[in-house]
């Protein structure tokens, strides 16, 4: 998702997604070498399970990151728990979590350690001063 050029909230898509925890329409991503995944339409209801499978290099990891609102090249419509993830990516990722997927989910190079801590605190509604204090304690323990 491009955070610099956010589209306006798609009110019709949010209404269409009513009751779904995940709603995707024409979700896709392209890279320098072509299509990474998609286009994909998907509705996921509460307590429903979705399985993503395919051969290595098919775009599964990118798709899973996109479905959590964490893949910047994503295009299309993505509603996560009533939030338009294309228009409000930071609100959407507060509702999602990603387990470690190889080296894909790592701290962003553009952020310092302090900025990474501040971003996580903002997303998790944790008091920044308390978190900074905890980081200092950890630094003292680990050296």
Where are these regions (language model features)?
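Conserved N-terminal strand/loop that marks the beginning of ABC ATPase nucleotide-binding domains
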Residues: 16-30
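Conserved beta-strand
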Residues: 24-27, 35-45, 76
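The feature captures the beta-strand-to-loop junction immediately N-terminal to the Walker
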Residues: 53-55
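Conserved lysine of the Walker
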Residues: 60
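Helix-to-loop junction immediately C-terminal to a conserved catalytic motif
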Residues: 68
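Conserved ABC transporter NBD signature motif
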Residues: 76-84
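ABC ATPase NBD coupling module
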Residues: 84-99
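Q-loop/switch helix immediately C-terminal to the Walker
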Residues: 95, 102, 109-126, 134-137
């Amino acid at each position: 998702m491009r955070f610099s050029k956010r589209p306006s909230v798609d009110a019709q898509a949010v209404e269409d997604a009513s009751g779904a925890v995940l709603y995707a329409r024409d979700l896709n991503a392209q890279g320098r070498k072509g299509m990474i995944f998609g286009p994909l339409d998907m509705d996921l209801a509460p307590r429903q399970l979705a399985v993503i499978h395919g051969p290595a290099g098919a775009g599964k990891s990118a798709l899973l990151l996109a479905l959590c609102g964490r893949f910047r090249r994503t295009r299309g419509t993505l509603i996560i728990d009533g939030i338009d993830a294309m228009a409000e990516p930071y609100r959407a990722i507060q509702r999602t979590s990603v387990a470690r997927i190889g080296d894909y989910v790592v701290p962003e190079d553009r952020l310092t350690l302090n900025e990474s801590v501040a971003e996580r605190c903002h997303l998790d509604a944790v008091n920044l001063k308390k978190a900074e204090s905890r980081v200092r304690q950890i630094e003292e323990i680990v050296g």
